[in-house]
């Protein structure tokens, strides 16, 4: 089979299996199997592939057809212009979180700020901020040792070892520092909504997805705890789930935060909350 024929048959299979963007998935996997870029594939459409080239692709295609995330199969994900390692130790970063980082960057006035990323996962938020603000003191915390190991590998990959201090802990436990900014993309899915999730999402660790019966429990607890860890006038920035904004905005007001506001993601969903304390 030629490169083009393999792409066409793989895309057709993915479409039958209900995979979104089947042709794009096929291109990524074939490029990965051949050690090429997607653009290089277009220059080789008529080249015939031998069995040694097809063998590794078959396993990737099978796993993708069963719902394993493309990012896990490739082992990497692009986020905010950088390539991060990605596997089942942490949540696959979402486009909404790239928007969160862009918003946070626009709100940092002091390049030497002390910043905390809560629920860092693979480290994409903390490390993206470290790239942008090399003079900042950046901390990142997660309850999962596996996620922290992946974040550490990403720090090495990006040449940022030592630029982010990774800590193991549940929310703000084991942290004595005070921060100018706390940012968090915590689990915000209700356990009762598990059946609504795609096969791809269910490959992410449960600890990175589910927060409790309502879904906003962890964010609510962070709102409470952050009052003792923010410097006067410090900012809390949160990514939240669908339909959670009203209750969480009320929680911020009840806990005496000020300058409280929200922002929609690119899909028009209220996804981000901002507030200052003190």
Model-derived regions: residue spans:
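Mobile active-site "lid"/loop adjacent to the S-adenosyl-L-methionine
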Residues: 188-218
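Conserved SAM/SAH cofactor-binding pocket of Class I
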Residues: 92-198, 221
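Conserved beta-strand positions that form and line the central face of beta-propeller blades
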Residues: 40, 208, 262
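Conserved AdoMet
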Residues: 30-103
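Conserved beta-strand segments of alpha/beta enzyme cores
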Residues: 83, 137, 163-165, 258-261
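Non-catalytic accessory regions of SAM-dependent methyltransferases
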Residues: 1-36, 40-42, 46-49
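Conserved Class I SAM-dependent methyltransferase catalytic core
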Residues: 213-276
């Amino acid at each position: 089979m030629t490169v083009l024929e393999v792409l066409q048959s793989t895309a057709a299979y993915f479409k039958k299996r209900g995979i979104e963007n089947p042709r794009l998935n096929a291109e990524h996997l074939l490029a990965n199997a051949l050690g090429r870029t997607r653009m290089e594939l277009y220059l080789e459409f008529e080249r015939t592939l031998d069995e040694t080239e097809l063998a590794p692709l078959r396993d990737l295609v099978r796993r993708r057809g069963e719902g394993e995330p493309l990012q896990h199969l490739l082992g990497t994900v692009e986020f905010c212009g950088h390539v991060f390692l990605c596997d089942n130790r942490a949540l696959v970063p979402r486009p909404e979180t790239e928007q969160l980082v862009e918003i946070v960057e626009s709100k940092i006035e002091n390049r030497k700020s002390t910043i905390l990323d809560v629920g860092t996962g693979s480290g994409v938020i903390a490390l993206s901020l470290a790239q942008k603000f090399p003079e900042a003191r950046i901390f990142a915390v997660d309850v999962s040792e596996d996620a922290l190991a992946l974040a550490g590998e990403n720090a090495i990959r990006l040449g940022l070892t030592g630029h982010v201090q990774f800590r193991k802990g549940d929310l703000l436990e084991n942290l004595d520092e005070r921060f100018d900014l706390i940012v968090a993309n915590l689990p915000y899915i209700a356990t009762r909504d598990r059946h609504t999730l795609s096969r791809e999402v269910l490959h992410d660790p449960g600890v990175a997805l589910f927060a409790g019966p309502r879904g906003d429990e962890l964010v609510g607890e962070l709102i409470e705890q952050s009052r003792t860890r923010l410097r006067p006038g410090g900012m809390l920035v949160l990514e939240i789930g669908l339909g959670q904004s009203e209750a969480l905005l009320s929680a911020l007001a009840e806990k005496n935060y000020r300058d409280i506001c929200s922002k929609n993601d690119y899909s028009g969903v209220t996804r981000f909350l901002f507030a200052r304390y003190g």
